Amino acid sequence: MGHRRWPRVAAAVAGVLVTAAAAAAFLNSAPHVQDRGDRFFVVEKGESLSSIAGRLDDEGYIRSPAFLLAAARLRRTEGSFKAGWYRVPPGSTTLAVHDLLVSGSQSLVKLTIPEGWTISRVAALVEERGIAPAADFEAAARSRALAADLAVPAATLEGFLYPDTYFVPAPFPAETLVSMMVETFFERLEKVEPGWRRLGGGGLLEKVILASIVEREYQLTEEAPLIASVFVNRMRLGIGLESCATIAYIITEIQHLPHPEYITLEDKGIDSPYNTYKWAALPPGPIANPGRVALDAAFHPARTDYLYFVLRDPDAGKHYFSKDLDAHNKAKKLYLKK
């Protein structure tokens, strides 16, 4: 009788093994939602494996977090998942995702954004580096809805795209890159002025607008707070800022013309709310994306009585500062070429 039961036991065991193999194959297979093309998954620094597995499941990269956890235990890779941005190809199995996150293979592109660049210049560089189309980047950076989502008190994200060096995969979603730059802005702002939230949205925007103008005017770090003080003093007295940088912004970013070699009297008469020669107020928005020096100067301007400045040493980037118009006119005659 015992010998007669062996075929049935063997068949039962085989059935269990086949079922287990089928279940494992199913749990390892890619979810159907991955048919949308390459997507990006972020492993945060110090994130636990259970958190990673849970998010992979929530975001539709894997079918079962338990299967990933079991695979990691069997392979002894629980502590080997590396932080970073990962491009997950469509159709990736759970084990393929596991191997990708353990390998740390990200193929990142270095993107360095200089201080004082505008949205359009950044967009062109993003496309040049093969990261995202310029049109997509501009659309995201000028999206009022995205600005609201990121708690930016402005119609666009001009001024809030922090100039820094970023490492991202290529290609990379433009909206995600823009969001990353804005998040970096607020991280850096916290170091510049921890109490910035007390300003409210309008107060913060004014500071960023001022910083963007300072960014386009200063050349020496030590002069940035002095230049900021000139603009603050003029605003307090109700005098127009008379910044050539705002005119250049109108010409290049609004009129889409080449950057002028110099600003003419005709240019200073352009009818635009960004014209600080025509209107005694800040422009309606930032004219560039300021860096740490300009932001610090806008939040902490020097205490001076200066109302004017003129470039006195183009090679060194030094300016001469004056307290009244008479002294300023004398400085212009002395330092500016006729």
Model-based region annotation:
Residues 18-19, 52, 213:
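Hydrophobic core
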Residues 7-11, 38-43, 79, 117-121, ...:
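Short low-complexity stretches enriched in small and charged residues
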Residues 2-38:
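N-terminal type II signal-anchor transmembrane helix
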Residues 11-15, 59-60, 83-85, 137-140, ...:
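N-terminal start-of-chain detector that recognizes signal peptides
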Residues 125, 131-132, 146-338:
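Bacterial extracytoplasmic/cell-wall-associated proteins, especially those involved in peptidoglycan
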Residues 15, 41-44, 89, 287, ...:
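Pocket-edge positions in alpha/beta enzyme catalytic cores
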Residues 24-191:
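Signal peptide-directed extracytoplasmic domains
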